[in-house]
């Protein structure tokens, strides 16, 4: 059978597929001939940044991925971590940045759908979702439209599918004007002895297509996700996928039912690069070839070419290697759920990826070189430059109370209620903590006391100032947020969003952030078990803020002892665990400097990982023993914002003692490794004794009570006034009534 080609391969065609001249030469040397148009599309999909990680692979190997609880680390659809009693949590975070900018509703919706498939492909039932969203400046003409579409897409898919959204982030910065970020996280529960993998095994076994039919939506999506944007962005709208959450719900139930029959040898969801990537990954991992007959692929559009079928990113589809004797039983399950079930190929022993279409062989390629032996680059990067510290006399002053009121009602520090009230946070009936606290918490169904905590974190302005410290801080804050609920942090997933890696200064950000993330994960016993890299987040040469989002999972052994951020009662002591001298001192890169004075200079705060570990373990023990009544991590906005958020959540005021140092640094400094905790009067002595034994500074800095917040010698601000400011910004902005400078 001869290889059929339908289109001449020209330099322009090669370039339009995102392949560099040296990569095309590598293809010619690899296969010994000119590729067909379909083969060119396959190489483009598999060798692009989105699928091959060719610029990041070298550095990702530096991350710790193993631990006593890790069942499966990176390399599968999702990470798997043991949570005792024969149960495990399966989770991952992935980006859908480029599609969401072009078509916000469908881009965000299919981002949620894709991450849910990654989880249930492993045999887990999804129990929680989060999303970390970054938008451009609020006064940019597209921002309101993008926020509306993305939030509706996230909610529309997640709500219909039936998974609670328990946490996330929403932030604004002009650096995201041309490239928003939509990072979707999902977690599911499974039995530790019933995990399903994507590695194909056995020769001559049927390769089965499952789920929805294939259309032209998403053709070239993975290639688009590996390129910068320019003026032709609107032309890329057809490359955005279209999702159907109700079909995905049926696919979930059908897959989990099928998995109980013993029919599944290997299974892989069709995400980026669709049928191409799923088939190549299954075969390459198992050292097997794959032959596909595209005439047997269920399609919903007429006259689809082999190129379109191989690169379509139509949603709600799976590929499976099946035990032949289970074919009828498996087919009956999918027919019952109204889904397609078609044997579209077989495994082979020749390590070839062979595609047949209308009697022609349209592709015949070496499968290993397409998959796990794709090109790998060691791109040049520049040494890191650390900004000079701010001089003591270079800290601009402001009224402490006025600054607090402005910050709680600002774009980046106000309540996200407008967002999360569009998400179903309670479906499944296991949600214990909803968005707005330090972490979302979900009860483990079937267990009397066990719960899981989830958080996603990164502070891009820190990463921009110092990628190494910023990488450490993203991990530390995620670990701290989990700890603040009483959870033992188990493991993390990363979503590394950066600009163009071909620019040495951007590659430097990536390299140093990875080094910081790796060091923090090792110090905190918080391995990375899954993740995603999203590069080329640039428009016309303007890159985003470096945004390595960390999503973490923690285990709460007894959710009755879980901590919350809201003050529990009046007349309780407020203590600052991990307090530096003077309550706070690091004002550079703070939201105070950015949002009150418009300054983003100076170094990021240093993260002392030994201190972080010591304080976090101490606070977690206090929570487990019922010695504290409220806990909140101290991060963006410093002590002032932490106390204000605790007051707003509870309706109870607070009085904080006047610091001995500069009140601006004390209240708005963003020193790391700190928790605000409250303790009832009858427990103070016990807590102080523990702190003394542990060698931990735990000063009493104030007291709860009243209906206002007073910071040192500043004027009081009523809790109602704080709450009104906190709740007003988002609905006012989305209603179109907000002045741009707010």
Curated annotation (Swiss-Prot):
Pathway: Purine metabolism; IMP biosynthesis via de novo pathway; 5-amino-1-(5-phospho-D-ribosyl)imidazole from N(2)-formyl-N(1)-(5-phospho-D-ribosyl)glycinamide: step 1/2. GO terms for molecular function: ATP binding; magnesium ion binding; phosphoribosylformylglycinamidine synthase activity. It catalyses: N(2)-formyl-N(1)-(5-phospho-beta-D-ribosyl)glycinamide + L-glutamine + ATP + H2O = 2-formamido-N(1)-(5-O-phospho-beta-D-ribosyl)acetamidine + L-glutamate + ADP + phosphate + H(+). It is found in: Cytoplasm. One of its GO terms (biological process) is 'de novo' IMP biosynthetic process. The active site is at residues 50, 96. CDD domains: PurL_repeat1, PurL_repeat2. Keywords: ATP-binding, Cytoplasm, Ligase, Magnesium, Metal-binding, Nucleotide-binding, Purine biosynthesis. This is Phosphoribosylformylglycinamidine synthase subunit PurL. It comes from Sinorhizobium fredii (strain NBRC 101917 / NGR234). The gene is purL.
């Amino acid at each position: 059978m001869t290889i059929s080609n339908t289109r001449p391969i020209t330099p322009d065609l090669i370039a339009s597929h995102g392949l560099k001249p040296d990569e095309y030469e590598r293809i010619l040397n690899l296969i010994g001939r000119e590729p067909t148009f379909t083969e060119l599309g396959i190489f483009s999909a598999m060798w692009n940044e989105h699928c091959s990680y060719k610029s990041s692979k070298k550095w990702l190997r530096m991350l710790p991925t193993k631990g006593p609880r890790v069942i499966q680390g990176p390399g599968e659809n999702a990470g798997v971590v043991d949570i005792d009693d024969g149960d495990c949590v399966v989770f991952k975070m992935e980006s859908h940045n480029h599609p969401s900018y072009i078509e916000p509703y469908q881009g965000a919706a299919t981002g949620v759908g894709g991450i849910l498939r990654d989880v249930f492909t492993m045999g887990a039932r999804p129990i929680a979702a989060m999303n970390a969203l970054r938008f451009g400046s609020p006064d940019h003409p597209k921002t309101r439209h993008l926020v509306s579409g993305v939030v509706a897409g996230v909610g529309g898919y997640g709500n219909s599918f039936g998974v609670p959204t328990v946490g996330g982030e929403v932030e604004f910065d002009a650096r995201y004007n041309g490239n928003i970020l939509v990072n979707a996280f999902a977690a599911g529960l499974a039995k530790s002895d019933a995990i399903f993998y994507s590695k194909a095994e056995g020769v001559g076994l049927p390769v089965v297509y499952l789920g929805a039919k294939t259309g032209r939506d998403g053709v070239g999506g993975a290639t688009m996700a590996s390129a910068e944007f320019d003026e032709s962005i609107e032309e890329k709208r057809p490359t955005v996928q279209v999702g159907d959450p109700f079909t995905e719900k049926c696919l979930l139930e059908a897959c989990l039912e099928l998995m109980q029959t013993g029919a599944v040898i290997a299974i892989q969801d069709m995400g980026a690069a669709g049928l191409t990537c799923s088939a190549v990954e299954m075969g390459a991992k198992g050292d097997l070839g794959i032959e596909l007959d595209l005439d047997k692929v269920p399609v919903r559009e007429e006259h689809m070419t082999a190129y379109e079928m191989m690169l379509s990113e139509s949603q709600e589809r799976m590929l499976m290697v099946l035990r032949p004797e289970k074919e009828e039983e498996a087919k009956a399950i999918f027919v019952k759920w109204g889904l397609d079930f078609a044997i579209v190929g077989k495994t082979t022993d020749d390590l070839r990826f062979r595609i047949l279409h209308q009697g022609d062989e349209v592709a015949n390629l070496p499968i290993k070189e397409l998959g796990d032996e794709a090109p790998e680059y060691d791109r040049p990067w520049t040494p890191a430059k650390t900004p000079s510290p701010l001089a003591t006399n270079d800290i601009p002053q402001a009224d402490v109370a006025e600054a607090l009121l402005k910050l709680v009602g600002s774009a980046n520090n106000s309540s996200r209620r407008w967002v999360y009230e569009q998400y179903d946070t309670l479906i499944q009936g296991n949600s214990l903590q909803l968005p707005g606290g330090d972490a979302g918490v979900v009860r483990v169904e079937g267990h009397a006391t066990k719960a899981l905590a989830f958080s996603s974190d990164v502070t891009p302005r820190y990463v921009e100032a110092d990628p190494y410290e910023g990488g450490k801080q993203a991990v530390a804050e995620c670990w701290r947020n989990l700890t603040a609920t009483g959870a033992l942090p188990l493991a993390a997933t990363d979503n590394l969003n950066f600009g163009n890696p071909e620019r040495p200064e951007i590659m430097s950000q990536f390299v140093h952030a990875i080094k910081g993330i790796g060091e923090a994960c090792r110090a905190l016993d918080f391995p990375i078990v899954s993740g995603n890299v999203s590069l080329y987040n640039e428009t016309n040469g303007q890159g985003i803020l470096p945004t390595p989002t960390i999503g973490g999972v923690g285990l709460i052994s007894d959710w009755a002892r879980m901590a919350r951020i809201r003050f529990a009662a009046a007349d309780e002591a407020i203590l600052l665990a991990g307090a530096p001298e003077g309550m706070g001192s690091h004002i550079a890169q703070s939201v105070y400097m950015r949002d009150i004075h418009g300054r983003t200079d100076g170094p990021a705060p240093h993260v002392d990982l030994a201190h972080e570990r010591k304080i976090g373990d101490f606070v977690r023990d206090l929570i487990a023993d019922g010695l504290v009544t409220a806990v909140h991590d101290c991060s963006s906005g410093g002590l002032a914002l932490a106390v204000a958020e605790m007051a707003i959540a509870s309706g109870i005021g607070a009085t904080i003692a006047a610091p001995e140092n500069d009140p601006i640094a004390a209240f708005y400094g963003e020193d790391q490794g700190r928790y605000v905790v409250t303790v009832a009067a009858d427990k103070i002595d016990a807590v102080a004794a523990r702190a003394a034994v542990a060698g931990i500074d735990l000063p009493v800095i104030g007291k709860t009570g009243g209906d206002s917040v007073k910071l040192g010698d500043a004027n009081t601000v009523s809790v109602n006034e704080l709450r009104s400011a906190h709740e007003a910004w988002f609905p006012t902005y989305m209603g179109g009534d907000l002045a741009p400078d707010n």
